[in-house]
Every structure is written in C-alpha cells, then in structure tokens.
Amino acid sequence: MVRVAINGFGRIGRLVMRIALSRPNVEVVALNDPFITNDYAAYMFKYDSTHGRYAGEVSHDDKHIIVDGKKIATYQERDPANLPWGSSNVDIAIDSTGVFKELDTAQKHIDAGAKKVVITAPSSTAPMFVMGVNEEKYTSDLKIVSNASCTTNCLAPLAKVINDAFGIEEGLMTTVHSLTATQKTVDGPSHKDWRGGRTASGNIIPSSTGAAKAVGKVLPELQGKLTGMAFRVPTVDVSVVDLTVKLNKETTYDEIKKVVKAAAEGKLKGVLGYTEDAVVSSDFLGDSHSSIFDASAGIQLSPKFVKLVSWYDNEYGYSTRVVDLVEHVAKA
C-alpha cells in the first residue's frame, strides 16, 4: 500500500484523487490547497461539469474531507515545506499545482518528509517518465520525477511504435487542444502570450507546446527529430494529436495500422488504444488511455510520408497515468 498526498486540488488533482481512491494499492492520506476551504473542496470533488458527479458519498469536517467514509486530512499551506508529510508517513507527494515543477521547488515536499515526489507537469530539471515508453528506466534512487504533459503522453507511445517499426526521420506535431484553466473567459491581459489572452470559448487560438520536443527526453533516439505547436479550441475536454512524419522505411498505411493495432493489443495495452470507428472528440470523455489511434482519420501521401491521428482525454487519461506512475515508483 502506497500512502500519497496531493498538493493542488485543481482539474488534475481532483481527478487523480478519484482514480487513486479506486486503486486497492493506493491510499490517499492528505491533500493541500491554500486557496480552498474544506466545504468547497468536498463540493468540487463531488460535482464535476465534465466528468460528472462522484458516484460515492462526499462530506467534510474541520480537518478532513470524507470520501466513502474515509477521512483525508486537509491543509491550506502555501509553502509545501511546512506540510506534515513526515508525521503523516507520506510515501509519495503528488504535486499538481503546476508551480512546484522543478527539482529545487519540488524538493520542498522531500524536506517536509515525503519520501518521493511525482510532478503532474513537464519539467526542465526533473527526469520525465511516460508510462509505456520509458518507465523501465526509473531507478529507486530518483526521489523526484515528472509525468511529463498530457500531450507528450499521447504522442510518445505512438511515436515509439512508429519509430521502432519504420524509423522516423523527422516530424511535425499539431495538437488540437481543449481549453484549460490558464485561458480567459473574455479578452484579458496576458502579457507573455497575447493570443492566449483572447476569449477561450469563441476562438481557435494558436499556441506553443513543448510536448513534441519533450518526446526526445523520454525517447533519446528521437531527440531533435520532432517539434510541434497547438491550437486551443472551445471544447471543455479531449484533445487530438496530428503527427506528420517522414519515415526511414517505405511502408503502406495498412501496414502502419497493423503495427499500431498489435502494440495496442500487446505491450502497450491500456496505454495505447486503437479504433477504426467514425469517432469524434466527445467519444473519448473519460477514456483512460494515454493515446487512442484513429486508424480511419490518418492519410498517406507517399511510401515514406504519413499523417497520423491520435485522441486523448487530456484530463482523465493523463490523471490515470499519474496514478500508474505513482504505483510504478512505489514498487521500484
């Protein structure tokens, strides 16, 4: 049984808790969010506009939220170093604030007494692991790790399968990405990203993403071979990766489908999905895969040049992998 604490009770923090509570080998012992009172934390956990109402019982008292009779201690500390992770016997702190995502800042959880930290955001200093891609490289001496981003979790398994079978010479990725909490409901100030300050619900907004370059960190053989961008679109959840690649080996689209399907039914089962149905984004709400290859959406121009399409629930699929990584780290 791994004892976890969650820091940051936003979109990812709340879904991570839902998923963790369903795992027999994971015990959620505490959560911290300096901006949320216990009654509000219980309310937000119970009601979710995207993923629906929590099926069990949720209540609270002065020091806990109570889920299905289980008491989870709550704290409102701004500085993670002040949290009682040592006295709470926290094995792994899950940091889903998006703030403490580098080795020096995530170290605060270790200083507070947690044995290890899993960051639910890409990191430029902490080692990144993508389940199904490079988690076997994790060693128990690593105290702080990152689960990378939702888009990297979608792209990396597909890129690995394609690169292993055909070789990727180079590629460009576009993610058509649902809106997130960083965006604005109406035009507002956004000094570092002017486009990002425009109304989220009424625009298609070009944006940057480091997801494709990050694939090179989890798959060194693809370092420098992929880059990408994003379009933020007015859907609440589920995104889609468009990966256009030049291959080293000539192949057919049917052969690509066979290879991806075999991986989805084999070594990447549960991480990579496969469909030939005429699907749209809402069909993947609540899908726990990192990446679902859409076989009927891709196209091929020539034997070495293809466009591949893969869906992901950028909230639920990613949060599922966070808990998978927590369990993997705990076992190592």
Curated annotation (Swiss-Prot):
GO terms for biological process: apoptotic process; gluconeogenesis; glycolytic process; heme transport; reactive oxygen species metabolic process. It comes from Saccharomyces cerevisiae (strain ATCC 204508 / S288c) (Baker's yeast). This is Glyceraldehyde-3-phosphate dehydrogenase 3. Homotetramer. Pathway: Carbohydrate degradation; glycolysis; pyruvate from D-glyceraldehyde 3-phosphate: step 1/5. It is found in: Cytoplasm; Mitochondrion. D-glyceraldehyde 3-phosphate binds at S149, C150, T151, T180, T209, G210, R232. Keywords: Cytoplasm, Glycolysis, Isopeptide bond, Mitochondrion, NAD, Oxidoreductase, Phosphoprotein, Ubl conjugation. The keyword Mitochondrion applies. It catalyses: D-glyceraldehyde 3-phosphate + phosphate + NAD(+) = (2R)-3-phospho-glyceroyl phosphate + NADH + H(+); NADH + H2O = (6R)-NADHX; NADH + H2O = (6S)-NADHX; NADPH + H2O = (6R)-NADPHX.
